[in-house]
Amino acid sequence: MRFIADFHIHSRYSRATSRDMELEALALWGKKKGITLLGTGDFTHPTYFAEMRSKLEPVNEGIYELKHGERETKFILTVEVSNIFSQGGKLRKVHTLIFAPNLSAVEGINDKLRSLGKLGSDGRPIFGFSAKELVKIVLDISSECLVVPAHVWTPWFSVFGANSGFDSLEECFEEEVKHIFAIETGLSSDPEMNWRLSMLDKITLISNSDAHSPNRLGREANVFECPLDYREIIGAIRDKDPRKFLFTIEFFPQEGKYHFDGHRNCGVVFSPLQTKANDYLCPVCKKRLTIGVMHRIDEMADRAEGFIPSKSIPSIHLIPLEEIIAESLGVGVGTKAVDGEYERLIRAGGSEFAVILDLPPEELKRFASPKVLEGIIRMRQGKIHIVPGHDGVYGKISILSPKDSGEGEVSREQMSLF
């Protein structure tokens, strides 16, 4: 079966996360979005894990659903872990995503990690040992677990981050690198940017929302064609199998909040070339700029932009439906007008991904307004305008601009959508 999966999310037990991020609401929003499989997130948190054990039941190997309530959305057991440690004479901060095959394995992981740090303070626990040690701990408990470095290019808290990361997976994980089969590209990079590094050719690139609120689910995701089974899914990722792992769904990376360099408080947004021309200093405050993902990839890349390696998993770039609606109405996301139109469109179209990804224009025309339809078509064609994100500020996207060219435009044909 073909299905969409978003593995990296957070529960209400993580900091700065909506109280609505609980299993029942996640299942309902998964159906709205058209996401068949959601990561649970935060399985190390004691209270949340107790909820999982009481509310979920297995339906396939390593796949769960609610005992009561919305059952179309399935769950796979996941957590993000933060490791802050010294290695190679530097302070390192690395976030990692863990997949577990069953609740018994999660219990074993939690028992071990509980002896090494606090699990109840945050749904994303923080530990003082290395990322390499985390791999050893997890795989000693279950060899069926999968460990994936998370949002690998963000300046802070990532394996390749400009401020506290490494220059290769081998440098970070040392002898345990043989167990690293995949990385998460993060919102501020996409597969095309990662293809510029030959050292990642054998690594599978996955994409997830890292959602902290229900409406953010699926802003990045993965599309599979395989049985809804833990071993099948993990096998497709490990093997980088294009017959089973069809493509990833991406944010336009310019919209990510660490894409370009800059200083948010000074209103400075620089490309890597502009940063170098200014000696890495902010022209306003004269302090060092926050170096973004594009700059870091430029530093590490050994290929030019546009290179496509063999056996790569393709990707498409989408914009959340609520953002398209908001621009068509000239109001903000989260307003009653946008929320009402969003609900109407997904009722008519079946789900958000059906509307923005699957349905052909002639079918959308039956229930979508002309402006929303134009926005969806322009998005599918890549004809949009973006002011790149920087220093923790999301980029600003414009779909319905009357301009067809100019600075900040992204214009490219994407793979066929229907």
Labelled PLM ranges:
Residues 15-18, 49-53, 157-164, 195, ...:
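Histidine/acidic-residue-rich catalytic or RNA/ligand-binding cores of hydrolases
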Residues 202-218:
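Short acidic/histidine-rich active-site segments
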